Amino acid sequence: MRKVFDIATIHKFERHLLERMLKLNTMSTYLRMLRAVYNRALLAGLTGYVPGLFKHVYTGTRADVKRALPPAEMGQALDISASLHRELKEAQIWFALLFLLRGMPFADLARLRKCDFKDGVITYRRQKTGRQIRVHVTEEAAELIRRCADRRTDSPYLLNILGDENCRFPLGRREEYRHYQQVLRRFNRKLKLLAAALRLGGKLSSYTARHTWATTAFHTRVAVGVISNALGHSSVKVTETYLKPFENEMLDRTNKKIIAYVKKCSIRQG
């Protein structure tokens, strides 16, 4: 444990993430998770204190990239009646569920258990933060759940996302993670094809539905604190990172309104 938590090893891990061509926010997530493990190990006396251990690696968040779709394009993506190849249709249904279930992360959707869905409500714990989330399932979402339900009697999963015909359930944590990573890569590839098939101007990824839910709520004047709770974020600061790219747009629109109002008043005075 002590050999893991030294400055050279942390820098080596960051270089490994860079070599994998990961985006800065993804790298930051891995490094912040490692920092959380270090802090717990430190409290438990399993490792020693290393000053500035994470000082020179990137643990921030960038908010300069918009991942959300405009409402009209999101509406197209949710239109399940569109004629598509079977595999693209499956990806579209999963994507729609991410949005309809209050911007649920794909990591949580894939791991939902059959026992999590009861009396029209899904109750689960977020993989990332451990926070318990309760989501009322709309009729539209319930129909999509029925369409992609995991009907294997030995499978604990609500949806037919993880595992294949050769799987023996229950999956171990390592095997579940391996299956999830494989499915996630395929899902993102299919979403790119789906965006092209639907002729969407924006890109689709497993994050798009969640970001679109958050930004749509923001533009319809839902309080940031409410959005944060709905998404199960660890703090409002995380939510603000989602929404920061849209702040300048809103400020620019406000500025134009103020200028127009002042000019209108000056004309009346004249």
Residue ranges and their predicted role:
Residues A68, R126-G130, D164, L231-K256:
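Catalytic-site neighborhood detector that most strongly recognizes the C-terminal catalytic loop/helix
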Residues V4, K55, R111-R147, G163-D164:
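Conserved tyrosine-mediated DNA breakage-rejoining catalytic core shared by Y-recombinases
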Residues D79, S83-R86, H179-Q181, R185-N229:
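Short, basic (Lys/Arg/His-rich) helix/loop patches that form interaction surfaces
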Residues H136-E139, C148, K244-G270:
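DNA/chromatin major-groove-contacting recognition/catalytic segments
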Residues L24, S28, Y49-F106, A110:
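Basic, Lys/Arg- and aromatic-enriched nucleic-acid-binding interface segment
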Residues C115-V121, G201-G202, V222-T241, R268-G270:
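Short, polar N-cap/turn motifs at the start of nucleic acid-interacting alpha helices
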Residues M1-V65, I80:
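N-terminal core-binding DNA-recognition domain of tyrosine recombinases/integrases
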Residues M74, E139-G201:
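Active-site/catalytic core of tyrosine-dependent DNA strand-transfer enzymes
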